[in-house]
Design a protein with these regions (language model features):
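Outer-membrane beta-barrel "beta-signal"
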Residues: 395-411
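Repeated loop/turn-to-beta-strand initiation elements of outer-membrane beta-barrel proteins
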Residues: 202-211, 257-260, 291-296, 330-339, ...
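Compositionally biased alpha-helical segments
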Residues: 31-180, 185-186, 192-194
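Transmembrane beta-barrel domains of bacterial outer-membrane proteins
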Residues: 166-247, 251, 263-271
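Transmembrane beta-strands of outer-membrane beta-barrel proteins
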Residues: 171-173, 189, 209-215, 260-262, ...
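Residues that define the transmembrane beta-barrel architecture of outer-membrane proteins
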Residues: 185-191, 240-244, 276-280, 294, ...
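Outer-membrane beta-barrel transmembrane domain signature
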Residues: 293-369
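Residues on the lipid-exposed face of transmembrane beta-strands in outer-membrane beta-barrel proteins
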Residues: 173-177, 191-197, 248-252, 266, ...
Length: 411
């Protein structure tokens, strides 16, 4: 019993000594764990929020986005993005550094004055006070003269900078398919890509240039195997459909709503016997309607047009001088849905019978992040199809359904 007690006391003594020896290392490890991984600086304190005080005394904290034409856009985690008129604001204080452009400064001009006020701002008593860095003197701009108040990052990119040719592209890509395996085998594939590059990329600045590239296509085939019925042999049959369209356009704005344009377009429609229609032209466009929820563009061009038909002789193929008169309409609907419509009339002046008309519609319905369901129609009329057996129908109608991926600009 005595030996057992002595052994127990010795073990307790050894354990105590080891614990005391490891205590400094344990404390150091705990301090390091509390301080975070080695070499990792502590989190920087968040910048104080921007603050709006309304004329009724209410206060809202968040992030100042911009002011355009007397309307302030402000983001709050509670209410999201809101637009506020100056007459509803008693005071505005920003920690966000901004640039203030008065009415005498046009962002569309390539050369801007070197002394544009930049810094944090306070707005009170109908005055915008700009506080530059390095304790420079405060600059004051009357509220009524502050046409744009833009954060410095946006100012540097959209006003002073210019995206590269492969930057600032946005648009959508759509794909759909139908496959049937039965007595007849049927498959149809359709797809479309629509890209646009607008400079500047923000909608609240007047555009300087716009480039669009579009492609749409549909290919289908119905086939049936050979068979024997009543002692008679029936050979295999197949029916093909193919419709393709591609176009590109570049616009130069000389007013906020009117622009010069050059364009090219290519069309193929197997059902109408059209092997290839080529268009090269230029003209003028007008944005007749523009608002946050809808836009309408009207265009007219003078162009060269060449039509080549399938299995046609040279006297059937056409070299034409004509025009394209087109209208494009976009409407933003509730729940993030977007409706697009385009109508075009293409007359020929050296052959009045060689005209065509087309009309397309599309509706995109978002369902998950950048993905949408899309429904579309394409109706085209070609007045001068090539002679064929059976006779070619002048009208072609197409209905499509698919999934659309929205491509967002990273600029």
């Amino acid at each position: 019993m005595s030996q057992h007690r002595n052994a127990t006391h010795r073990l307790s003594f050894v354990f105590t000594v080891v614990s005391l020896a490891l205590l400094p290392f344990t404390a150091t490890s705990m301090c390091r764990a509390a301080a975070g991984p080695a070499g990792t600086p502590p989190d920087a304190p968040k910048a104080p929020p921007d603050v709006i005080i309304f004329t009724n005394g209410d206060q809202l904290s968040g992030t100042f986005i911009h002011e355009v034409g007397g309307t302030v856009t402000f983001h709050s985690d509670i209410v999201g993005d809101i637009n506020i008129e100056w007459d509803k604001i008693k005071e505005l204080r920003t920690q966000t550094k901004v640039a203030v452009l008065n009415k005498s400064i046009s962002p569309e001009k390539k050369k801007l004055p070197p002394n544009i006020p930049q810094g944090t701002v306070t707005v009170a008593d109908d005055k915008v006070n700009v506080h530059p860095e390095n304790n420079a003197p405060v600059e004051t701009v009357p509220v009524k003269d502050a046409q744009y108040i833009i954060d410095q990052n946006t100012f540097n990119k959209e006003v002073l900078g210019r995206p590269g040719i492969f930057q600032a592209w946005a648009g959508s890509a759509t794909a759909g398919a139908t496959i049937v395996q039965a007595t007849q085998k049927q498959y149809t594939f359709n797809g479309a890509v629509a890209l646009a590059r607008v400079v500047p990329t923000v909608s609240w600045l007047n555009p300087k240039e716009r480039t669009t590239i579009d492609f749409s296509g549909s290919y289908g085939k119905i086939s049936q195997h050979a068979y024997i019925s009543g002692g008679e042999f029936f050979p295999p049959t197949s029916i093909k459909s193919a419709i393709y369209h591609a176009d590109a356009e570049h616009d130069w704005y000389f007013t906020p709503r009117v622009y010069f344009l050059v364009q090219t377009a290519f069309d193929h429609n197997f059902s109408q016997g059209l092997d290839l229609q080529q268009i090269y032209g230029g003209g003028i466009g007008w944005t007749a309607l523009k608002s946050p929820v809808q836009e309408l563009d009207l265009k007219g061009t003078i162009q060269y047009e060449k039509q080549s038909f399938i299995n046609a002789t040279d006297d059937v193929n056409q070299n034409l001088i004509g025009s394209t008169f087109a209208a494009m309409y976009m409407r933003k609907l509730p729940k993030g849905m977007i409706f697009n419509q385009e109508v075009s009339y293409i007359p020929a002046y050296n052959n009045l019978h060689a005209y065509s008309v087309s009309e397309s519609n599309s509706l995109a319905m978002p369902f998950y992040k950048s993905l949408s369901l899309s429904i579309g129609t394409l109706d085209s009329y070609l007045n001068n199809p090539a002679p064929a057996l059976p006779p070619t129908q002048r009208n072609s109608f197409q209905f499509t359904f698919g999934a659309t991926y929205v491509i967002k600009s990273k600029y």
